[in-house]
Amino acid sequence: FMDIFRDVCLAEYPYTPFADAFHTMRSMLLPVLYLLGSEVPVADVYHAISTGYGGLLACLGSSVHHAPVLLTEHGIYTREREEEIIRADWVVPSFKDRWIRFFYLLSEEIYRRAFRVTSLFHNARKTQIDMGCDADKCLVIPNGIQLDRFKDIPLKPDDGWVDIGAVVRLAPIKDVKTMIYAFFELHERLPKVRLHIMGSVDDEEYGAECHALVDTLGVRDLIFTGRVNVVEYMEKLDFTILTSISEGQPLSVLESLAACRPCVTTEVGCCRELLEGAPGDDFGVAGFVTPPMYRKGLADAMERMCTSRARRIEMGERGQRRVATYFLHEQMLANYRALYDET
């Protein structure tokens, strides 16, 4: 191994300290060797929920026990790792490309072996195909929710205030700071608006920074509720907002639409498809989509939503019809049962 490794270093990393190269390659390969030495339980099918190391373990089980592999990706794991590696300070710069190629190699293996590969929405399926997965293997199985929990929630009475909700963990990936800045700008334009941020603190440091930002800006009518019963709290809301910088198919948006509440979201994951419809969906627009981290765009979109109750109600009804047609819990279970039967 050391002879091979030395040759690789001389050929590809002549100006990188040997210790950096050694520990990087060790970190990359040791988990793979541990996994390949694992005893995988016997199963009728191995269903991985990501590529990467989990996908490798599913491939090992398939190879040892001669059983089919299924892959479900809620996010495109390889792309997520690529973005993380590009931004990371802990990765030796000269090894970033090798780390990225390593994760692409792992995804190629399970894409090749899998009997079927599912994603949550059409653009994710296109990404899987672009990354080398056989199009005939790829199908979309969306998330599903229990519509009955939300469909009869009454609309909030028109009391002169517009109440905006955000069902969100306080974590950097949710970009709550941009939400706070955008709401501050909105409140300067429309004084009778309130923002309810509903969710637990996922990152204590980030949560403290969000509270400090509210104090620094002097934002009024912003409520951190902590964790709440979303079904009960939805009665207090006119519409919802999501400002994440990365998502798959957010359940919070589906639940909001199921409750006849339109949404303002960033253009991440499946959000545009949820609010504007996939090909063949003619229900119409159920909210507004803005670029991530764009404060003014978010404030503008919220203002448009705030200024017309009739528009909010119409958009909410469109969203509820979309959920009732494409995103039911029962449909999701039936689709996965059919997939298991097919194997």
Description of each model-found segment:
Residues 123, 144:
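Carbohydrate-associated surface elements
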Residues 277-295, 304-309:
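Conserved acidic donor-binding segment of nucleotide-sugar-dependent glycosyltransferases
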Residues 154-185, 196:
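Conserved donor-binding/catalytic core segment of Leloir-type glycosyltransferases
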Residues 262-265, 269-276:
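Short hydrophobic beta-strand element within catalytic cores of glycosyltransferases
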Residues 196, 207-227:
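Nucleotide-activated donor-binding/catalytic signature segment of Leloir-type glycosyltransferases, i.e.
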Residues 245:
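Aromatic "clamp/platform" in nucleotide-sugar-dependent glycosyltransferases that forms part
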Residues 62, 297, 304, 311-326, ...:
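A short, well-ordered alpha-helix in the C-terminal region of glycosyltransferases
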Residues 33-42, 77, 94-117:
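Membrane-proximal helix-turn-helix segments that form the acceptor-binding/catalytic region
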